[in-house]
């Protein structure tokens, strides 16, 4: 467990993810989602003096933690960039095709969720922000204030998988005409009233808040770009380890890996002559999807939705 500003963060699938990387003492590794450094610290403990670890994060608080770690350990460097941009960063550092492993631990961290000032949670009232990097992009409040009802409904439905997206979006637009949304609790209350069928054990605002967060941070677009960039960065034999926390993320990861196991042949038109190489797999998948153990679920209930998938680059 790492402590940050009074907020606890327990790294999910810590040992399993680092074991899946098969860390080599002299290898170069990327932690695409540094967070509070749980995975990075364990990777560093397995690296030798010639090993290197490059961490990425958009969150300024995570970067501050990373800079403190970098000051202690010269093998580690942290950069304030999305993992979607890791291709550019790796190229700038002359590391393209030389990376032994990439780890992506997706979603929002406990310190982000639990800090009311970040605006991620409907459980704790705070400014309606939701940005991983509060200095860039459009906040959730700004999006809600200006987006057409159809766009808000699309975000709730596509990214939150909310079946009452249209009804909830209309309630949001009706209310914003009277008073703009500035606080998470305010939005959560309107969504709660507009949701006619509450799921047992789940706050009625859960799915809509997820949709907003994913949209504000372009999480699925970043994931698609990051997966492609990670594959290009890896050396042959390098490992890609991805931990996702909801079905939309996991679907993207699963389809990406399945496509590359089949080579490029699936993407070509029928009856088109192709080279044999088009049928040669680019990766192999290591084992089945892995989930948190009973012991981890008991210690950290937020791990219940975690799914880990592992692939190795073949060419």
Curated annotation (Swiss-Prot):
GO terms for molecular function: rRNA (cytosine-N4-)-methyltransferase activity. S-adenosyl-L-methionine binds at residues 37-39, 57, 83, 105, 112. It holds the Pfam family Methyltransf_5. GO terms for biological process: rRNA base methylation. It comes from the Bacteria. Keywords: Cytoplasm, Methyltransferase, rRNA processing, S-adenosyl-L-methionine, Transferase. It is found in: Cytoplasm. GO terms for cellular component: cytoplasm. The keyword S-adenosyl-L-methionine applies. It catalyses: cytidine(1402) in 16S rRNA + S-adenosyl-L-methionine = N(4)-methylcytidine(1402) in 16S rRNA + S-adenosyl-L-homocysteine + H(+). Its EC number is 2.1.1.199. InterPro entries: RsmH, SAM-dep_MeTrfase_MraW_recog, SAM-dependent_MTases_sf. Specifically methylates the N4 position of cytidine in position 1402 (C1402) of 16S rRNA. Belongs to the methyltransferase superfamily. RsmH family. This is Ribosomal RNA small subunit methyltransferase H. It comes from Pseudomonas fluorescens (strain SBW25). The gene is rsmH.
């Amino acid at each position: 467990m790492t402590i940050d500003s009074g907020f606890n963060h327990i790294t999910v699938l810590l040992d399993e993810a680092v074991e899946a990387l098969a860390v080599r003492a002299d290898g170069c590794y990327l932690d695409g989602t540094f967070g509070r450094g749980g995975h990075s610290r364990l990777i560093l403990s397995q690296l030798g003096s010639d090993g290197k670890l490059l961490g990425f994060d958009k969150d300024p608080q995570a970067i501050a933690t990373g800079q403190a770690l970098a000051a202690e350990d010269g093998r580690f460097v942290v950069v304030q960039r999305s993992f979607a941009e890791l291709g550019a960063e790796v190229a700038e550092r002359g590391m393209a095709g030389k990376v032994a492993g990439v780890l992506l631990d997706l979603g929002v961290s406990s310190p982000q969720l639990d800090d009311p000032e970040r605006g991620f949670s409907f459980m704790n009232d705070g400014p309606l922000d939701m940005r991983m990097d509060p200095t860039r992009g459009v906040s959730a409040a700004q999006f809600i204030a200006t987006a057409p009802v159809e766009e808000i409904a699309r975000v709730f439905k596509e990214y939150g998988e909310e079946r009452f997206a249209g009804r909830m979006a209309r309630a949001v637009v009706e209310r914003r005409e009277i008073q703009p949304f500035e606080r998470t609790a305010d939005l959560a209350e309107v969504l709660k009233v507009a949701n006619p069928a509450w799921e047992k054990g789940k706050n009625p605002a859960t799915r809509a808040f997820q949709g907003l967060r994913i949209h504000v941070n372009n999480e699925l677009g970043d994931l698609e770009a990051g997966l492609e960039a990670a594959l290009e960065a890896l050396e042959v034999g390098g490992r890609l380890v991805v931990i996702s926390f909801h079905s939309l993320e996991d679907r993207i990861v699963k389809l990406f890996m399945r496509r590359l196991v089949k080579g490029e042949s699936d993407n070509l038109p029928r009856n088109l002559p192709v080279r044999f190489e088009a049928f040669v797999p680019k990766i192999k998948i290591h084992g089945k999807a892995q989930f948190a153990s009973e012991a981890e679920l008991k210690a950290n209930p937020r791990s219940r939705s975690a799914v880990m998938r592992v692939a190795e680059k073949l060419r």
